[in-house]
Amino acid sequence: MAHNEAVDVVLVGAGIMSATLAVLLKELDPGLKLEVVELMDSGAAESSNPWNNAGTGHAGLCELNYTPPAADGSIDIKKAVHINTQFEVSKQFWAFLARKGTFGSAKSFINPVPHLSFVQGENGISFLKTRFEAMSKHHAFSSMEYTEDKATLAEWMPLMMSGRAADEKIAATRMLNGTDVNFGALTNQLLNHLSSAPDTQIKYRSRVTGLTRKGAGWTVMVKDVNGGGTREIDAKFVFLGAGGAALPLLQMSGIEESKGFGGFPVSGQWLRCDNPEVVKHHQAKVYSQAAVGSPPMSVPHLDTRVVDGNKSLLFGPYAGFTTKFLKHGSFLDLPLSVRVANIKPMLAVARDNMDLTKYLVSEVMQSMEQRLESLRRFYPEAKAEDWRLEVAGQRVQIIKKDAKKGGVLQFGTELVSAQDGSLAALLGASPGASVTVSIMLELIERCFPEKTRTEWASKLNEIFPAREKILETDAQLYERVSTQNDEALELVEKKSQEQSFA
């Protein structure tokens, strides 16, 4: 066995989370020695891959499940506002890197694509109108447009209006400042940027086989998948950012904070169209409402995707079930994750989520014709020969202890960290990649509290002139920061002079 290497930071998984955290830490302390270890032979091979990622550029502009109606019919926009400001924080980091000049062009990973919400029927229209009235009063959504006019709708979403019944009651809202983000390209751009920094290694085809306490830090055992050799790395801090594999790695650590967590894997499928004659008629991300009783992951949307400069359309998601935690994982992932500490929450979730189980089974059993029927609700003239089924990435939803129910299924992400801040893991799924930077900032503040208050404070303020809370309330600051980010990311033509955020 090779002699132990010593580093400051080990990051497990070469996806968007680890890549973001690694680059951010090197900006804050260029002297840090860090290593990224990844099982696959490239970065962004799982959920960060553009064909695996369920939704991109989430900014709360069009996702109707972020603005649920209350019992009295009013709309709560808090979650949409929060996700919007989190996305603006992500844009601040990308803009900071783009301005450096050594990072490369932002056009390789972010493109302007309008975000639309689309509803059908009287109830849908009533909901969307109320939502529009509530959201357009907030500065983050002040440019939102609403229409029920068929001619206007035909301009906004021509593919979706052709062949539709003239008397069908429909409505839509539009935000022109939406984006499509290729998180695979962004991840690899971050990793390339990282690999040029001193004291930084990215090791592919490497499997973490052990994680044990060593003094104030950790010893990470890593097996070379190709050669079979094993080495040990001593690290002061370990981040488990391995997507669905983060849960078993967290369990391997044995930290008290990991007890009681379980995972519920959900796979996804998409219909994909690359026919340029179809694709050219749809330049938008259009989200609608999930069917009554369906989980939030089932919100249907028809998206323009830009990957490597080529446009495609994706429609879905169609959910599925497998016991794998990663697309390239093992069918034993779920059974091997069962522990004494999490079996009660997992059984409680199984008991209380029979509707979800039935939904997943029904999705798995769908024929191609049934999937096309769902698509034709959006695109009435869809032809079977233009679309093919693609398997998306794995999402592992969080199961956690609950005092009343025994266990609950949680949709979203959760940061789990050791009490001493020496180890952290990211569990869960949506909104995921779009709010990566906010999540990694939370991790840094939680695991390195002293440094964020002292030696890292000025650099953090330079990179992030405005954080989420102030962006939620200060309209002028929001406008200024957002405009400068958009210019740096080449989303709009440059108009404003560079100015202080003070």
Swiss-Prot record:
Its EC number is 1.1.5.4. The keyword Flavoprotein applies. Pfam families: Mqo. Coiled coil: none annotated. Transmembrane segments: none annotated. It catalyses: (S)-malate + a quinone = a quinol + oxaloacetate. Its cofactor is FAD. GO terms for biological process: tricarboxylic acid cycle. SUPFAM superfamilies: FAD/NAD(P)-binding domain (SSF51905). Keywords: FAD, Flavoprotein, Oxidoreductase, Tricarboxylic acid cycle. The keyword Nucleotide-binding does not apply. Pathway: Carbohydrate metabolism; tricarboxylic acid cycle; oxaloacetate from (S)-malate (quinone route): step 1/1. One of its GO terms (molecular function) is L-malate dehydrogenase (quinone) activity. PANTHER family: L-2-HYDROXYGLUTARATE DEHYDROGENASE, MITOCHONDRIAL. NCBIfam families: mal_quin_oxido, PRK05257.1-1, PRK05257.1-4, PRK05257.2-1, PRK05257.3-2, PRK05257.3-4, PRK13339.1. HAMAP family: MQO. Belongs to the MQO family. This is Probable malate:quinone oxidoreductase. The lineage of its organism: Bacteria, Pseudomonadati, Pseudomonadota, Gammaproteobacteria, Pseudomonadales. The gene is mqo.
